[in-house]
């Protein structure tokens, strides 16, 4: 069983942000290896924290952060020909404070460029599920995009669509917006660049996953720019937390297919009399272990990496 990390505390590295899953630290210039190009850098740590319905739950999933980080790193490398990413290749151990065990962070942390985030979640959908299905049932559209009549739950869309959403703070909920609203927020050129990159990467990843018996139903990306306005993909990439993966052999139109993510946790929480606000309830050990196994299976099938 891997070591569990619920929260990272690294003396000498200023904490910049503690999100639902990731802790992000500024790296002082003197801690960077000699010859590091000018600019600001971050240490991003994927913890084992578990969130559902935008609430961080009290029980972690052992090794989840390592699995998420490895999936992201796999996809960053796999898609580097399509889009530059925030990774630097700087060894994590070289920037850790003295006395910190590098083994604890080796598989769950990365050194990244510090970028200016594009303030919109970039979502690609290839199938009608989740909030997209709810929008379609209500309006016949998803994020203002007209879709054919008579589509069923989990049905593949004629073409993948781009459906942006707002970026919510921890504890708040993202809200779907249409493309025009995104243009007003970030400008037409940036909106088009993000949309085109999102769909290009989604199509590539969906084809790759399909060859391995997995359907990539939808996914969420985050983008940022450097001082020269160059666009990068950042944060996490095509993980079971940011994406909806289905086993192709269990896919059936008209149903909500099982997924390689924390669906066991969400299903359990739906049985409770809980208002979906903090603090969250305790999760049974069986649910934790089944969820951990699902993350591990996704890592194995997509990247060929086995977990302990």
From Swiss-Prot:
Reaction(s) catalysed by this chain's protein: 5-amino-1-(5-phospho-D-ribosyl)imidazole-4-carboxylate + L-aspartate + ATP = (2S)-2-[5-amino-1-(5-phospho-beta-D-ribosyl)imidazole-4-carboxamido]succinate + ADP + phosphate + 2 H(+)
EC number: 6.3.2.6
Pathway, per record: Purine metabolism; IMP biosynthesis via de novo pathway; 5-amino-1-(5-phospho-D-ribosyl)imidazole-4-carboxamide from 5-amino-1-(5-phospho-D-ribosyl)imidazole-4-carboxylate: step 1/2
Alphabetical list of SUPFAM superfamilies matching this protein: SAICAR synthase-like (SSF56104)
GO molecular function term, any single one: phosphoribosylaminoimidazolesuccinocarboxamide synthase activity
Family matches, as CDD domains: SAICAR_synt_Sc
Name this protein carries in UniProt: Phosphoribosylaminoimidazole-succinocarboxamide synthase
Organism of this sequence: Stenotrophomonas maltophilia (strain R551-3)
């Amino acid at each position: 069983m891997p070591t569990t990390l619920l929260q990272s505390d690294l003396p000498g590295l200023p904490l910049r942000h503690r999100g639902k899953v990731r802790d992000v630290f500024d790296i002082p210039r003197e801690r960077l290896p000699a010859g590091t190009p000018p600019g600001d850098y971050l240490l991003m740590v994927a913890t084992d924290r578990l969130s559902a319905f935008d609430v961080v739950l009290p029980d972690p999933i052992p090794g989840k952060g390592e699995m998420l980080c490895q999936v992201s790193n796999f996809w960053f490398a796999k898609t580097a020909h399509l889009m530059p990413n925030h990774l630097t290749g700087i060894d994590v151990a070289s920037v850790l404070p003295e006395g910190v065990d590098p083994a604890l962070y080796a598989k769950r942390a990365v050194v990244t460029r510090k970028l200016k985030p594009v303030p919109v979640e970039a979502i690609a959908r290839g199938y009608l599920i989740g909030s997209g299905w709810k929008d379609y049932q209500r309006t016949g559209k998803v994020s203002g995009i007209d879709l054919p009549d008579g589509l069923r739950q989990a049905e593949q869309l004629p073409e993948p669509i781009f459906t942006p959403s707002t970026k919510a703070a921890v504890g708040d909920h993202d809200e779907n917006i249409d493309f025009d609203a995104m243009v007003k927020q970030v400008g037409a050129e940036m909106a088009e660049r993000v949309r085109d990159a999102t769909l290009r990467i989604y199509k590539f990843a969906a084809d790759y996953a399909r060859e391995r018996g997995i359907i990539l139903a939808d996914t969420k990306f985050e983008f940022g720019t450097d001082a020269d306005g160059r666009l990068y993909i950042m944060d996490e990439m095509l993980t079971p937390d940011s994406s909806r993966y289905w086993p192709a052999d269990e896919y059936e139109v008209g149903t909500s297919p099982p997924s390689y993510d924390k669906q066991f946790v969400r299903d359990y929480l739906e049985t409770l009399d809980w208002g979906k606000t903090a603090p969250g309830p305790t999760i049974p050990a069986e649910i934790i272990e089944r969820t951990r196994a699902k993350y591990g299976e996704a890592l194995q099938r997509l990247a060929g990496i086995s977990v302990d």
